[in-house]
Amino acid sequence: MKTAALGMALALAAGAVLAGDQQAHNTLTAAEKAAGWKLLFDGRDLNGWREFKKTTIGPGWQVKDGVITLVDPAKADDIITTDKYANFDLVFDWKISKNGNSGVYYHVIETGDHGYETGPEYQLLDNAHGEPPLQQAASLFGLYAPSKDVTRPVGTFNHSRLVVDHGHVEHWLNGVKVAEYQIGSADFKARVAGTKFAHWPLFATADTGYISLQDHESVVAFRDIKIKPLK
């Protein structure tokens, strides 16, 4: 009995240590702060964001239980950061509804009617929806397909990373690098030329711009949005 009790006590102690080591959502560790990371979402409100070409955010976007959720696409638009970013390392968690579709744009400028006219898109998708590879989760939408599907089951959070460094871009999903490209390269330009993006002359031309969360008529949720500006 004493041996069993001791074993139980040790197990509980180990669990407490693990729980203590688990970082709270929407926070930065001391090491992250020292390395230059900053939060784009603090888990409480949408300060630091606004809708595209607006100064406010409609009721379709809500914050609850430490998560940004697009709950009513009919009452929302794409939201963008209030600050612009050039070169950066961006991480975020996201989950999508069944058959859902969304995305994260970068280097968005407020020219034209929509963010996708200027900003490349890190695609977010329920891959079970059956879209082609160029439109699957973690693709550069319409241009570069992910090398593999490492998405988690719909309704659970995925972890994404987007690195933009002087035109060299990496897409990561759940710890795996799945796409890599160079904006402005011959290959990139050739791919753009064969798509709808060719109709927008400012697409992927800005060296700096806003980061945007897409309203694509699907329920989507975000948390742990962090960015580290790069030189």
Give the residues covered by each predicted segment.
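Bacterial N-terminal signal peptides that target proteins for export
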Residues: 1-8
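Carbohydrate-interacting regions of secretory-pathway proteins
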Residues: 18-231
